[in-house]
Amino acid sequence: MDLTNSTFLSNQLTPFLSFSREQWAELRKSVPLTLTEQDLKPLLGINEELSLDEVRTIYLPLVRLINYYIEERIQRQQVMNRFLGVNPDKVPYIISIAGSVAVGKSTSARILQSLLSQWPERRKVDLITTDGFLYPLAKLQQDNLLHKKGFPVSYDTARLVRFLADIKSGKPKVSAPVYSHLIYDIVPDQFDVVDQPDILILEGLNVLQTGDRSSQTFVSDFVDFSIYVDADEDLLKAWYISRFLKFRQSAFSDPNSYFKHYATLSEPEAISTAGRIWDEINGLNLRENILPTRERANLILTKGTDHAVELVKLRK
């Protein structure tokens, strides 16, 4: 790819290099595609139709880039170890994935986990979502915060920071709480155990937030490479409503579902309800707390109408 062209030169006054879909695809080079259609299907979200072409075009160049960063980090760590004369515990490389509800963060995280684990080094790649660090439903109800679920105030951030501090210190068998979307709550006495992986992918709404830098340690302080998955709010709202309609016919009909009362809504009622939830909760959270963190990411993936990434921005 010719990086002397006008598109590249226009990036000179910004903190990011911008790539069209076609330009980014060229950076795949010779990275092989290790996923099949059969492998891809279970990685997709309920409202996403992501093709192998998207994996080739967007995710293979990204995996190539991340592996360069990991190799560079390993080399720097080896230099430090020789200087200090120490043989420290293995420290995982942490990748965070942020973005709005319904943008496809979870799908991106699962695809990256699969691709990175199949790299020739056969690295161990774990995936944790920050949903597990939401306060329990009873506490949110007690504190009158149910309408703020997903907002920064609804997370046990101190617990999440301790979890990441343990991971980064090389501690083995670190436990993370498990969240169930079915019951809309933390699952009692159930944990995911992270045991010294080579890479940890952390996926969540607010993983790029920093708040008041003078007084706290933040999730972003532990992250080595951060990704923000972006789309226009009109698209996000439409995707959220479409997903809500599909849940109405599937997960909401489960008698154990917290949202089982939505299963009886007519389609117009469901569309109206989903739109109201977006306007009052998810859209508000996006504008107030999530979108303002976008420019802190190392990489921004901007999606278009069909969920395909149209623009990639890489921090210089």
UniProtKB/Swiss-Prot annotation:
Keywords: ATP-binding, Coenzyme A biosynthesis, Cytoplasm, Kinase, Nucleotide-binding, Transferase
InterPro entries the record matches: P-loop_NTPase, PanK, PRK/URK
Catalyzed reactions per annotation: (R)-pantothenate + ATP = (R)-4'-phosphopantothenate + ADP + H(+)
UniProt subcellular location: Cytoplasm
Broad class of the protein's primary localization: cytoplasm
Gene: coaA
A Pfam family per the record: PRK
Residues at which ATP binds: G99, S100, V101, A102, V103, G104, K105, S106
CDD domains: PanK
Protein name per the record: Pantothenate kinase
